[in-house]
Regions:
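Flexible mid-to-C-terminal extensions adjoining Fe-S/redox cofactors in radical SAM and related proteins
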Residues: 221-299
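Canonical radical SAM enzyme core domain
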Residues: 12-74, 81-94, 112-124, 145-147
Length: 299
């Protein structure tokens, strides 16, 4: 058994004192139940300073994920400060190196979101990181952006972004494998496999996403959407409905003889909601993973 706390956002490090207030209580709960505690942080990296990471390392900081969507000229055009429009690459890069050099983490997951905006523009990112000599300390997470639900409170929302900059399946496969090969050419270990479903919070019977006001969601992608709230702390709702549906989906996949079930888990429940149809990523998984196997082991 393991009690895993993943600080996610929005930006989870925006109010570091909230973490400082909460972590001792979470550790106390874990110790009272005799189970280890692991802490993870998924952050944009701007506020991943040595001060807060040193604090979190005292709570078994097992994973730090930051996002770099390209070299400075690309990343800073997408991820800049709200008021000044100043870029964030340099700050994130500095925080990454400090985290590794000071031993707060042994490895950093670098998330790179792939879309038409940064297509063919990622080589200098790998060149910069390779010059730092951190190839053995970087785990690459390549993300193919997907559609989402409209949000009336946010003009020009993420669903509109996908309509303009999202890839078709053929484009996604081609770009994913190109970027993986490019990373390998600079000494980084490319992703070993593309997985969807099995590691998702929505699939796990003892995993939940908790919002800032104690609201509980089953899917991370539904946070902030009141219609998807399934409960409120301290009461934890039943997970039976999701588990039952997941098992039925997996049974259907197995009946069809699909060999992707272990890395698919029946597909993404959120994408089913977005697209109004059963989500079956079989073709995408087969094509990308075949390419990754070839990249790793040759023909």
């Amino acid at each position: 058994h393991l009690m895993r706390i993943v600080w996610h956002g929005g930006e989870p490090l925006l109010y570091p004192n909230k973490l400082r207030d909460t972590m001792p209580s979470l550790l106390e709960i874990a110790e009272r139940r005799g189970i280890p505690l692991e802490t993870q942080v998924v952050t944009n990296g701007v506020m991943a300073t040595a001060d807060i990471l040193e604090f979190l390392s005292g709570y078994n900081l097992g994973r730090l994920q930051i996002t770099l969507d390209g070299p400075p000229e690309v990343h800073d055009s997408r991820r800049y400060r709200r008021g000044t429009k100043a870029g964030s690459f340099a700050e994130i890069h500095s925080n990454m190196l400090a985290a590794l050099n000071q031993g707060f983490v042994q490895r950093i997951d670098v998330r790179v979101n792939l879309d038409i905006q940064n297509q063919g523009k990622l080589e200098r990112l790998f060149a910069i990181l390779a010059a730092d000599g951190v190839q053995d300390n970087i785990h690459l997470s390549l993300g193919i952006i997907t559609n989402t639900l409209p949000n009336e409170s946010c003009s020009g929302g993420a669903n509109n972004y996908f309509d303009v900059y999202g890839f078709s399946e053929d484009q996604a496969v081609e770009e994913y494998l190109k970027v993986a090969a490019l990373a390998k050419s600079y000494g980084f270990q490319p992703p070993g496999e593309l997985i969807v479903g099995p590691w998702c919070v929505a699939r796990h019977p003892h995993a939940w996403t908790v919002g800032p006001d104690g609201e509980i969601y089953k899917c991370l992608s539904t946070v902030g959407r009141p219609e998807h709230v399934v409960g409120h702390l301290p009461e934890v709702p039943s997970n039976d409905a999701v588990t039952s549906y997941t098992l039925r989906r997996i049974a259907d996949c197995l009946d069809q003889g699909c060999n992707m079930v272990p890395i698919c888990g029946g597909g993404c429940l959120f994408e089913e909601k977005v697209n109004g149809t059963t989500n079956c990523p079989k073709a995408l998984l087969q094509r990308v993973n075949a390419g990754l196997l070839t990249l790793e082991h040759g023909q």
